[in-house]
Protein backbone atom coordinates (compact mmCIF):
# COMPACT_ATOMS: atom_id res chain seq x y z
CA UNK A 1 0.00 0.00 0.00
CA UNK A 2 1.37 3.39 -1.03
CA UNK A 3 0.46 5.04 2.29
CA UNK A 4 2.68 2.63 4.25
CA UNK A 5 5.54 3.28 1.81
CA UNK A 6 5.01 7.00 2.33
CA UNK A 7 5.06 6.53 6.11
CA UNK A 8 8.31 4.52 5.99
CA UNK A 9 10.08 6.82 3.56
CA UNK A 10 8.92 10.02 5.26
CA UNK A 11 10.16 8.76 8.64
CA UNK A 12 13.52 7.82 7.15
CA UNK A 13 13.64 11.22 5.45
CA UNK A 14 12.80 12.99 8.73
CA UNK A 15 15.70 11.22 10.43
CA UNK A 16 18.04 12.42 7.66
CA UNK A 17 16.70 15.94 8.10
CA UNK A 18 17.36 15.77 11.86
CA UNK A 19 20.96 14.67 11.20
CA UNK A 20 21.41 17.47 8.68
CA UNK A 21 19.96 19.95 11.18
CA UNK A 22 22.45 18.82 13.83
CA UNK A 23 25.31 19.14 11.34
CA UNK A 24 24.21 22.61 10.25
CA UNK A 25 23.81 23.94 13.77
CA UNK A 26 26.86 22.28 15.32
CA UNK A 27 29.38 22.40 12.47
CA UNK A 28 28.24 25.28 10.26
CA UNK A 29 26.65 27.42 13.00
CA UNK A 30 23.60 28.00 10.79
CA UNK A 31 20.43 28.41 12.85
CA UNK A 32 17.75 30.12 10.74
CA UNK A 33 17.39 28.11 7.53
CA UNK A 34 18.14 24.86 9.33
CA UNK A 35 15.27 25.44 11.78
CA UNK A 36 12.86 25.97 8.88
CA UNK A 37 14.21 22.83 7.21
CA UNK A 38 13.76 20.83 10.42
CA UNK A 39 10.16 21.99 10.78
CA UNK A 40 9.07 21.32 7.21
CA UNK A 41 11.15 18.17 6.69
CA UNK A 42 9.79 16.41 9.76
CA UNK A 43 6.25 17.64 9.17
CA UNK A 44 5.90 15.58 5.98
CA UNK A 45 5.75 12.29 7.86
CA UNK A 46 3.74 13.73 10.73
CA UNK A 47 1.00 14.80 8.33
CA UNK A 48 1.05 11.48 6.49
CA UNK A 49 0.80 9.60 9.80
CA UNK A 50 -2.06 11.80 10.98
CA UNK A 51 -3.89 11.23 7.69
CA UNK A 52 -3.45 7.47 7.94
CA UNK A 53 -5.49 7.55 11.14
CA UNK A 54 -8.14 9.95 9.88
CA UNK A 55 -11.83 9.15 9.86
CA UNK A 56 -12.22 9.15 6.09
CA UNK A 57 -10.49 9.16 2.72
CA UNK A 58 -11.06 12.90 2.67
CA UNK A 59 -9.09 13.23 5.94
CA UNK A 60 -6.22 11.24 4.46
CA UNK A 61 -6.28 13.25 1.25
CA UNK A 62 -6.29 16.56 3.13
CA UNK A 63 -3.31 15.53 5.27
CA UNK A 64 -1.42 14.29 2.22
CA UNK A 65 -1.98 17.65 0.52
CA UNK A 66 -0.42 19.33 3.57
CA UNK A 67 2.46 16.83 3.41
CA UNK A 68 2.89 17.70 -0.27
CA UNK A 69 3.16 21.41 0.57
CA UNK A 70 5.67 20.67 3.34
CA UNK A 71 7.68 18.61 0.87
CA UNK A 72 7.77 21.54 -1.57
CA UNK A 73 8.84 23.86 1.24
CA UNK A 74 11.58 21.43 2.25
CA UNK A 75 12.88 21.45 -1.33
CA UNK A 76 13.07 25.25 -1.14
CA UNK A 77 15.08 25.27 2.11
CA UNK A 78 17.44 22.62 0.72
CA UNK A 79 17.98 24.73 -2.41
CA UNK A 80 18.78 27.79 -0.28
CA UNK A 81 21.19 25.85 1.92
CA UNK A 82 22.97 24.51 -1.14
CA UNK A 83 23.07 27.82 -3.01
CA UNK A 84 24.40 29.60 0.08
CA UNK A 85 27.16 26.95 0.42
CA UNK A 86 26.01 25.44 3.71
CA UNK A 87 25.76 22.00 2.10
CA UNK A 88 27.84 20.64 -0.78
CA UNK A 89 26.69 19.14 -4.08
CA UNK A 90 26.73 15.45 -3.02
CA UNK A 91 24.87 16.21 0.24
CA UNK A 92 22.30 18.28 -1.63
CA UNK A 93 21.83 15.78 -4.46
CA UNK A 94 21.29 12.87 -2.09
CA UNK A 95 18.73 14.43 0.23
CA UNK A 96 17.00 16.43 -2.53
CA UNK A 97 16.50 13.23 -4.52
CA UNK A 98 14.84 11.62 -1.49
CA UNK A 99 12.60 14.66 -1.10
CA UNK A 100 11.56 14.49 -4.76
CA UNK A 101 10.82 10.77 -4.44
CA UNK A 102 8.58 11.48 -1.45
CA UNK A 103 6.81 14.19 -3.44
CA UNK A 104 6.14 11.78 -6.31
CA UNK A 105 4.71 9.17 -3.94
CA UNK A 106 2.48 11.70 -2.19
CA UNK A 107 1.21 13.20 -5.46
CA UNK A 108 0.46 9.72 -6.85
CA UNK A 109 -1.37 8.77 -3.68
CA UNK A 110 -3.51 11.91 -3.63
CA UNK A 111 -4.40 11.42 -7.29
CA UNK A 112 -5.41 7.83 -6.59
CA UNK A 113 -7.52 8.88 -3.61
CA UNK A 114 -9.27 11.47 -5.75
CA UNK A 115 -9.79 8.99 -8.57
CA UNK A 116 -7.56 10.92 -11.01
CA UNK A 117 -5.46 8.05 -12.34
Predicted regions and their residues:
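Short, C-terminally biased terminal segments at protein or domain edges
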Residues: 1-46, 50-117
